[in-house]
Amino acid sequence: PPDVIKWARGWDLAATSEDEKGDPAYTAGVLIGKRRNERYIVADVINRRLSSSDVREIIKQTCIADRVKYGRVATRLPQDPGQAGKDQAQSFMKLLAGFTVKCIQESGDKVTRAEPFSAQWLGLEGMDKGNVDVLIAPWNEEYFNECENFPQSKFKDMVDASSSAFTELESGATYSAPPKDSQLGKSSYWNK
C-alpha cells in the first residue's frame, strides 16, 4: 500500500534445516507497515526451516529485497543473552551493514510480548474487526492458523516475529540523521 509511513520486519530465529530429525522450529520474518490512517498491514511472511548459514543468507537477501520494494525497513533481530548472543548480534550487524538493524534482547514471555499486536489485531470488544490488515498471499493460511491457535500452537515463530516487528514500529524510534549541530555545540559527524 502506498500509504505506509513506516516499515519494520521482525525475525524469530531457529537454526535447524528441514532434513534434520524431529520437528524443529522455524525461522520466521514478518514485515508489518504502519499506515497513515493508524492501521497496520502484514505485507510479507517468511517461515522456513533453515541451517544457520542459510538463516544468515535469507535475512540478508530479505533486507535487500525489502529495500528495493518498500524503501526504508527497520529490521529487528532477537539477541540471546550472554557472550554467544553478543557475538551473534555483532556478526549480524557486520553482515547487514548499510541497513537499519537492531539486535534486541527480548524481555518477558512470548504471550506477554504478543499482547500489544494481538490487541490491535482483535480491536475493541464489540468491533467487527481490529486495526490489522493482511495482504492476500500464499502464506496467509499458515500465518492465520498459527496466530489463531496461539499460544497453544506447537510453533510460535511467526507470532514472535510479528510481535517483534510491531514493537519496533511502536518503539517511537525515528530513523533520520542527527541534527547538524548537537546540543553539545560540536558539529555533527554526519555533516561534511
Regions found by a protein language model. Give the residues of each.
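Conserved helicase motor
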Residues: 107-110
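Short, surface-exposed amphipathic charged segments that create phosphate/polyanion-binding patches used
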Residues: 113-124, 148-152
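Small-residue (G/S/T/A) turn/hinge positions that recur once per unit in extracellular repeat modules
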Residues: 130-132
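RNase H-like, metal-dependent nuclease domains and their acidic two-metal-ion catalytic environment used
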Residues: 1-104, 134-192
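Short acidic-glycine loop/turn motifs at beta-strand connectors
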Residues: 33-38, 122-124, 128
